[in-house]
Amino acid sequence: MIFSKAISTIFHPIFAPFVSVLLTCCVVQKTIIVDSCKIPNILISVFIVTIVVPLLATLYMLKKKYVASFEMKEKKERVYALRVNSLLIGLGYLFTNKIYFCQYNKDLSTLLKLEFLAVIFSVYIASEISKHYKISLHLIGFGGVCAVIMRLTSLAGDLLWLLCIFILLSGVVASARRYAGAHTRKQIYFGFFLGFVIQFLFFYL
């Protein structure tokens, strides 16, 4: 049980958007002419918007007892927290897009915008689904990251090795969530499928 909780914490879905952007920036630096000195600014802003702000919001909700724990086991807690965070990430996107994304290479800017919009949409859809059905947020995150890696193959060529690593990690996290009794298989599969499809489809909009 301790191991499964550790895995769930280390691979918390809050980190998924940042990981996607980090992978994108690493690949883009090698394939597109872009000022590498500006990459840290992007990563710092995304880290703040997708990790620091939602974390602070969750801590505030814990303090005000809108949620009982970080696990958010109750349906109402998950819906409320997801809606708040989708709004905060959306506002963060508007700020980041205006200050950073629009200043950079068009190809990189487009990729980052689509990833952000897909994340916002995924979180919002997850909040709506959570009204009626519990879904694995961890696997939504992993599904999204895997979709980003597949998308990046059009720029960097064969990234099969990286995709295999994240699919393997998805399996580890899924097993940990199952062992902890947090989700059924259907909830896990549905989460991965939803995260993957939303992120993948946004690229082709």
What are these regions (language model features)?
Residues K38-V53, A118:
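Alpha-helical transmembrane segments
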Residues K106, L112-L205:
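Membrane-embedded catalytic cores of phosphoryl/pyrophosphoryl-handling enzymes
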